[in-house]
Amino acid sequence: AVSVLVLPASAASLNNSAIQTAITLGAMDTSQTGSLDAAVTRGAFAKMLVSFSAYRESASQQGNLGTLYKDVPGSSQWAPYVRIAVQQGWMNGYTDGTFRPDNTVTLEEACTAALKLLGYKMTDLNGVFPTAQLNKAQELGLRNQLNRSQSEAMNYEDCALLLYNTLTANTASGSAYGTSLGFTVSNGQVDTSTVMLKSLKGPFVAAEGTQLPFTPVSIYRNDKVSASAELNRYDVYYYSESLQTVWIYTRKAAGRILSLIHISEPTRRSYIS
């Protein structure tokens, strides 16, 4: 038997490829897809940056490494992501020894971090901050369809779009950034399915009392975002532990995953035959 696992779009807000990709990479979870207009904090943006980088799978393995900034203790949910973002030079703390993880991230801060993610040196840009950074981001297409102005706070949808545009943009060395992460980039679109297949496990048929080996962040049930990862008897499920995602299908026969596809219409369904 052959099956095709769909990366679902269960509502209008999820029809955007940027949102789907952010969820797939772990930059966002199902709780945030319900409030896409919520402002993104510096701590949350550090996580999003790392999720769109080569460090996305190793960040959660760092554990408690001690206090990074006086307002980011090692026990903070943002600590591993802030550590990586700062060590890689994508974000900076403040001279008073704080990171201010709860401050909202602005357009110019987010664009600057994205440019650094792409390997651009701020000293090579023409002009002064933030005009130089915003102009370079515009030139590279990072601000495509991003309706924010200087000093405006970024919400989750904005950040997902900015980082999706980063995947399709050229790095300082001239290659599409997404390809360096193993994605296929074509005509401004990013296909993450090849990466997902490497970490995908299943299909499995749930028995009475079956438990997942991890607590998923993103849950899809019958191609719709769900808040519950409860497995019922005979549910067919797939999961990616590294992406902290599970796909559950009720009353469907098991098959073998051969490919994953992205769709944008909420009425499309995956099939298993």
Give the label of every model feature segment.
Residues 1-18, 23-46, 50-79, 88-108, ...:
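Feature responds to low-complexity, polar/acidic, surface-exposed segments characteristic
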Residues 85:
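Histidine- and acidic-residue-rich, metal-dependent catalytic cores
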Residues 153-157, 162-164:
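Structured, solvent-exposed acidic/aromatic patches
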Residues 261-272:
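Single conserved hydrophobic/aromatic residue that forms the stacking wall/gate
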